[in-house]
Protein backbone atom coordinates (compact mmCIF):
# COMPACT_ATOMS: atom_id res chain seq x y z
CA UNK A 1 0.00 0.00 0.00
CA UNK A 2 1.40 3.40 -0.91
CA UNK A 3 1.39 6.38 1.42
CA UNK A 4 -1.05 7.97 -1.02
CA UNK A 5 -3.48 5.11 -0.38
CA UNK A 6 -3.05 5.70 3.34
CA UNK A 7 -3.94 9.36 2.86
CA UNK A 8 -7.04 8.33 0.92
CA UNK A 9 -8.06 6.00 3.74
CA UNK A 10 -7.72 8.79 6.27
CA UNK A 11 -9.50 11.32 4.09
CA UNK A 12 -12.48 8.98 3.96
CA UNK A 13 -12.67 9.10 7.73
CA UNK A 14 -10.91 5.81 8.46
CA UNK A 15 -9.44 5.63 11.92
CA UNK A 16 -5.65 5.85 12.35
CA UNK A 17 -5.91 2.87 14.71
CA UNK A 18 -7.21 0.77 11.81
CA UNK A 19 -4.25 1.87 9.70
CA UNK A 20 -1.87 0.89 12.49
CA UNK A 21 -3.43 -2.58 12.53
CA UNK A 22 -3.10 -2.83 8.76
CA UNK A 23 0.52 -1.71 8.86
CA UNK A 24 1.32 -4.00 11.78
CA UNK A 25 2.42 -6.76 9.43
CA UNK A 26 4.98 -4.41 7.88
CA UNK A 27 6.86 -4.38 11.19
CA UNK A 28 7.37 -8.15 10.86
CA UNK A 29 8.35 -8.35 7.19
CA UNK A 30 10.71 -6.35 5.01
CA UNK A 31 8.71 -4.03 2.76
CA UNK A 32 9.23 -1.01 0.56
CA UNK A 33 6.84 1.91 0.72
CA UNK A 34 6.90 4.49 -2.05
CA UNK A 35 5.67 8.01 -1.51
CA UNK A 36 5.48 10.42 -4.41
CA UNK A 37 5.20 13.63 -2.44
CA UNK A 38 4.77 15.78 -5.54
CA UNK A 39 1.50 13.95 -5.96
CA UNK A 40 1.11 14.28 -9.73
CA UNK A 41 2.97 14.76 -12.99
CA UNK A 42 4.67 18.10 -13.49
CA UNK A 43 3.12 20.40 -16.07
CA UNK A 44 3.68 24.12 -16.57
CA UNK A 45 -0.03 24.73 -15.93
CA UNK A 46 0.06 22.90 -12.57
CA UNK A 47 3.30 24.66 -11.67
CA UNK A 48 1.76 28.08 -12.34
CA UNK A 49 -1.52 27.28 -10.57
CA UNK A 50 0.39 26.22 -7.43
CA UNK A 51 2.64 29.27 -7.57
CA UNK A 52 5.45 26.86 -6.74
CA UNK A 53 8.65 28.47 -5.43
CA UNK A 54 10.63 25.65 -7.08
CA UNK A 55 11.59 26.12 -10.71
CA UNK A 56 11.32 22.47 -11.75
CA UNK A 57 9.09 20.98 -9.05
CA UNK A 58 5.55 21.16 -7.80
CA UNK A 59 5.02 21.81 -4.10
CA UNK A 60 5.39 18.63 -2.01
CA UNK A 61 2.30 17.17 -0.37
CA UNK A 62 2.82 15.97 3.17
CA UNK A 63 -0.35 13.97 3.92
CA UNK A 64 0.72 10.56 2.67
CA UNK A 65 4.17 10.58 4.22
CA UNK A 66 2.81 12.16 7.41
CA UNK A 67 0.26 9.41 7.91
CA UNK A 68 2.85 6.77 7.07
CA UNK A 69 5.27 8.14 9.67
CA UNK A 70 2.41 8.36 12.18
CA UNK A 71 1.38 4.75 11.72
CA UNK A 72 4.88 3.31 11.27
CA UNK A 73 7.06 5.01 13.92
CA UNK A 74 9.90 2.53 13.37
CA UNK A 75 10.74 4.22 10.04
CA UNK A 76 13.91 6.14 10.86
CA UNK A 77 15.35 6.73 7.38
CA UNK A 78 14.03 7.39 3.91
CA UNK A 79 15.64 6.94 0.52
CA UNK A 80 15.17 10.09 -1.51
CA UNK A 81 15.40 9.74 -5.30
CA UNK A 82 15.65 12.65 -7.71
CA UNK A 83 15.74 11.88 -11.43
CA UNK A 84 17.04 14.52 -13.81
CA UNK A 85 16.34 14.12 -17.53
CA UNK A 86 18.28 15.87 -20.27
CA UNK A 87 15.03 16.89 -21.96
CA UNK A 88 11.70 18.30 -20.81
CA UNK A 89 10.04 16.43 -23.69
CA UNK A 90 10.64 13.01 -22.16
CA UNK A 91 8.56 11.18 -19.59
CA UNK A 92 9.30 8.87 -16.69
CA UNK A 93 8.03 6.05 -18.91
CA UNK A 94 10.67 6.96 -21.51
CA UNK A 95 13.25 6.67 -18.74
CA UNK A 96 12.00 3.23 -17.64
CA UNK A 97 11.99 1.99 -21.25
CA UNK A 98 15.60 3.08 -21.81
CA UNK A 99 14.74 5.76 -24.37
CA UNK A 100 17.02 8.36 -22.79
CA UNK A 101 20.77 8.51 -23.10
CA UNK A 102 21.51 11.20 -20.52
CA UNK A 103 19.92 10.84 -17.09
CA UNK A 104 21.29 11.73 -13.67
CA UNK A 105 19.89 10.09 -10.56
CA UNK A 106 20.59 11.39 -7.09
CA UNK A 107 19.92 8.98 -4.24
CA UNK A 108 20.23 10.12 -0.65
CA UNK A 109 19.60 8.44 2.67
CA UNK A 110 17.82 10.95 4.87
CA UNK A 111 17.29 10.49 8.59
CA UNK A 112 13.77 11.19 9.76
CA UNK A 113 14.19 14.01 12.31
CA UNK A 114 13.39 13.07 15.90
CA UNK A 115 10.67 15.74 16.08
CA UNK A 116 8.79 13.83 13.34
CA UNK A 117 8.83 10.42 15.04
CA UNK A 118 5.83 9.02 16.93
CA UNK A 119 3.50 11.91 16.18
CA UNK A 120 -0.13 11.95 15.11
CA UNK A 121 -0.54 13.53 11.67
CA UNK A 122 -4.33 13.63 11.90
CA UNK A 123 -4.43 15.52 15.22
CA UNK A 124 -1.11 17.36 15.68
CA UNK A 125 -0.97 20.65 13.77
CA UNK A 126 2.59 21.39 14.94
CA UNK A 127 3.73 18.03 13.54
CA UNK A 128 2.05 18.79 10.20
CA UNK A 129 3.85 22.15 9.99
CA UNK A 130 7.23 20.66 10.98
CA UNK A 131 6.78 17.90 8.40
CA UNK A 132 6.01 20.47 5.70
CA UNK A 133 9.12 22.46 6.64
CA UNK A 134 11.22 19.28 6.45
CA UNK A 135 9.81 18.40 3.02
CA UNK A 136 10.34 21.97 1.80
CA UNK A 137 14.02 21.78 2.81
CA UNK A 138 14.37 18.51 0.87
CA UNK A 139 12.65 20.16 -2.10
CA UNK A 140 15.11 23.06 -1.98
CA UNK A 141 17.96 20.57 -2.39
CA UNK A 142 16.14 18.78 -5.20
CA UNK A 143 15.56 22.10 -6.94
CA UNK A 144 19.29 22.96 -6.76
CA UNK A 145 20.21 19.53 -8.18
CA UNK A 146 17.71 19.86 -11.03
CA UNK A 147 18.96 23.35 -11.90
CA UNK A 148 22.60 22.26 -12.25
CA UNK A 149 23.76 21.83 -15.84
CA UNK A 150 24.35 18.38 -17.29
Positions of PLM-derived features:
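Short amphipathic alpha-helices and their capping/turn segments at secondary-structure boundaries
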Residues: 19-28
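A cross-family acyltransferase "interaction/gating" segment
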Residues: 2, 27-120
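Accessory terminal regions of nucleic-acid processing enzymes
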Residues: 118-150
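Generic hydrophobic, helix-prone segments enriched in Leu/Val/Ile
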Residues: 19, 75, 95-96, 135, ...
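Charge-dense, low-complexity intrinsically disordered segments
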Residues: 9-13, 55, 122-125, 129
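Membrane-interfacial amphipathic helices and adjacent loop/beta segments
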Residues: 1-20
Amino acid sequence: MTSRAVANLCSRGKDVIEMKKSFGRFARYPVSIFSFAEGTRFTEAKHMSQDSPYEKLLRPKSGGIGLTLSTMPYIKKVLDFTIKYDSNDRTFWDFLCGRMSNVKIQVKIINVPENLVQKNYAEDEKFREELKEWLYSIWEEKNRFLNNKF
